[in-house]
């Protein structure tokens, strides 16, 4: 069991629970290293065993990228949450922590439908406090990301000139970023010019040409 998982399990046990369900995509990536899209997995952590619930599309990837988990493909007629509830019942989990902010009402209903004898307790996130304290490796990754972003921006400056479209600039920035080792973007690249787009804080790059 990796250190991050063990810290979560220990904290959950300290609060009187014998299991925890984790469904937030970024938390799952942090704890397991899984790089698949968000919303395609749910974790069930217990003292004895940990489960990674997904669907058939991601079974192979989950098995490759995660360690210390039993990868479970949800059964016919079940979804990620109902399958997780079923596993909790089969594992004999009596009191299970969940982060209510990460579940919809339907998710919760699916979860409890398969585990009538398990008490699911909504609490705050157990993972976010852990993520807030950065390891030396994480700090180095952040510093590297800053270097990539800075160098990509300075390389872009030669491209920004009258007649070039916002889309051209966005494409060049993304090229510069990836060519330096960048692996992805938090959101669609924002390139906004002129009195209209320039005032829109979430503008998307358009075919508008840069003007003086």
Question: Positions of the model-derived regions?
Answer:
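Flexible, acidic/His-enriched mid-domain "rim/lid" segments that flank
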Residues: 3, 79-185, 196
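Terminal domain-start leader segments
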Residues: 1-51, 82-92, 110-113, 119, ...
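Acidic/histidine-enriched ion/cofactor-binding microenvironments in catalytic or ligand-binding pockets
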Residues: 44-46, 185, 198-212
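Basic, ligand-binding patches in group-transfer machinery
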Residues: 191
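A generic local secondary-structure boundary/capping motif
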Residues: 9, 31-32, 86-87, 131, ...
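Short helix/loop capping segments that flank catalytic or ligand/cofactor-binding pockets
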Residues: 31, 61-62, 106, 199-202
């Amino acid at each position: 069991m990796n250190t991050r998982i063990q810290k979560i399990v220990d904290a959950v046990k300290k609060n009187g629970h014998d299991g925890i369900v984790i469904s937030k995509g970024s938390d799952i990536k942090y704890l397991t290293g899984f790089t698949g899209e968000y919303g395609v997995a749910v974790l069930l952590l217990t003292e004895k065993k940990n489960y990674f619930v997904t669907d058939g599309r991601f079974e192979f990837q989950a098995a490759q990228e995660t360690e210390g988990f039993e990868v479970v493909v949800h059964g016919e007629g079940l979804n990620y949450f109902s399958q997780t509830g079923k596993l909790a019942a089969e594992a004999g989990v009596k009191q299970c922590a969940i982060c209510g902010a990460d579940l919809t009402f339907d998710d919760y209903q699916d979860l409890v439908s398969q585990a009538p004898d398990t008490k699911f307790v909504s609490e705050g996130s157990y993972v976010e406090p852990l993520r807030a304290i950065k390891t030396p490796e994480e700090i180095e990754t952040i510093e590297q990301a800053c270097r990539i972003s800075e160098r990509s921006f300075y390389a872009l400056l030669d491209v920004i000139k009258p007649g070039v479209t916002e889309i051209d600039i966005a494409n060049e920035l993304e090229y510069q970023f990836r060519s330096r080792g960048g692996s992805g973007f938090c959101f669609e690249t924002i390139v906004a010019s002129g009195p209209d787009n320039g005032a829109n804080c979430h503008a998307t790059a358009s075919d508008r040409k840069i003007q003086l």
